[in-house]
Structures are given as C-alpha cells and as structure tokens.
Amino acid sequence: MNITSADFFCSYSSLNGLPSDGRPEIVFVGRSNVGKSSLLNSLCARKGLAKTSSTPGKTRLINYFLINENLYFVDLPGYGYAKVGHGERESWGKLLTDYVVKRDEIALVVLLVDARHPGMGSDREMMEFLDYCGRPFGIVLTKWDKLKQAEKSKARRTIESCASNARFIVNYSSLSGAGRDKLLERLDLFSQ
C-alpha cells in the first residue's frame, strides 16, 4: 500500500453517526500509551495527523482518518489505563467493545502490543475477544527500537506463543520507521 493522502476525518463519542459510505475500516487498538497515535503518524508519514501525548488515555474518542480517499484508519481509545475514573474506564471499554462487535465495515483489527511487555493479560484478553467476534487481526509490536537484541528474540517468541490466530506479526518502531513497509504490505491485503 502506498499512502498518498491521509486526513483527519472525524471523531465520535458513540456509535451514532459513524460513516456509512461503505469504505473498509482498518482499526488500531491497544493498551493506553502503546503508541497508536505515533504509529498512525509514522505509517501515514504525517507528523501531527493523530494527536500524541506522553500521558496515557489521551485518545478518548473513536477517531477516523481517511486514507487515499478509499478507506479509513480508525484509532480507538486505549484500554487498561488505571488512572482515570472507574466510570470513564467502563465507558471507554463499552465504546471499544460495542464498536468491534457491531461495526460491519471492519476489514481488519491491528492490535498494538508494547514489545517491552508482550503477553500481558489485557492484550491476551483482546486477542480472545477478537477471535470470539470473528474479527481478523494482526499484531504490531511497538517500541521495537527500545529493546536489546536478546530482548527482541524473547519478545517475539512470547507474542508468537499467545497469538496463533494473528494474520501477521510486525515489529515496528515509530521513531525510525522500521517495519513500516512490511506493515503497509500487510494492510494492503485488507484495504479493498
């Protein structure tokens, strides 16, 4: 896939009013502060396309980005962040699960996993949930550049052992762009 245009489309706080134009949706999901917004900026080669923050839980809405005028990248709120109120955390969780369960336009879910902490319970639960919903998913190990070589091998083995149903696993560094071409190649298979 060659991304020639990437623009913020709209944010939604509920499933009401989501686009109904039939474009496929590639959805990015993961724990809070896993690097979803940074990955989107890197993937689209557009710094500032998706708002980033060092504060976990910054993405609180469903954010749509129109890619090449023919599909959407969708940034969902992160899960697993403990420092927001219980009610707000439940609200994000309901928004995320309702979207994944009910949205017919989803072509692929891309689960971002912090390479420094592969195999966390919440990530495993998300994989099980995606399997249960029958959603095809791939995994991106983010922050790959932060690992030493021995840690990279261990992280890869760990995620492979718990992600047998993933369509792909890509190692990614938003900082250097390592893994970008491979991920775009994988996403292209689901962009039609």
From Swiss-Prot:
Cofactor(s) the record lists:
Mg(2+)
Which SUPFAM superfamilies would you find in this protein's record? Answer: P-loop containing nucleoside triphosphate hydrolases (SSF52540)
GO MF terms listed in the record are: GTP binding; metal ion binding
Q: Which InterPro entries match?
A: G_ENGB_dom, GTP-bd, GTP-bd_ribosome_bio_YsxC, P-loop_NTPase, Small_GTP-bd
Q: Name a biological process GO annotation.
A: division septum assembly
Read off the Pfam families from this record.
MMR_HSR1 (PF01926)
Q: Which residues bind Mg(2+)?
A: S37, T59
Which superkingdom, per the lineage?
Bacteria
Residues annotated to bind GTP: 30-37, 57-61, 75-78, 142-145, 172-174
Domain called EngB-type G: residue spans: 22-192
| Keywords of this entry | Cell cycle, Cell division, GTP-binding, Magnesium, Metal-binding, Nucleotide-binding, Septation
Family membership, please give it. Answer: Belongs to the TRAFAC class TrmE-Era-EngA-EngB-Septin-like GTPase superfamily. EngB GTPase family.
Q: Which PANTHER family match?
A: ENGB-TYPE G DOMAIN-CONTAINING PROTEIN, MSS1/TRME-RELATED GTP-BINDING PROTEIN
Q: Can you say what this protein is called?
A: Probable GTP-binding protein EngB
Source organism of the structure: Chlorobaculum parvum (strain DSM 263 / NCIMB 8327)
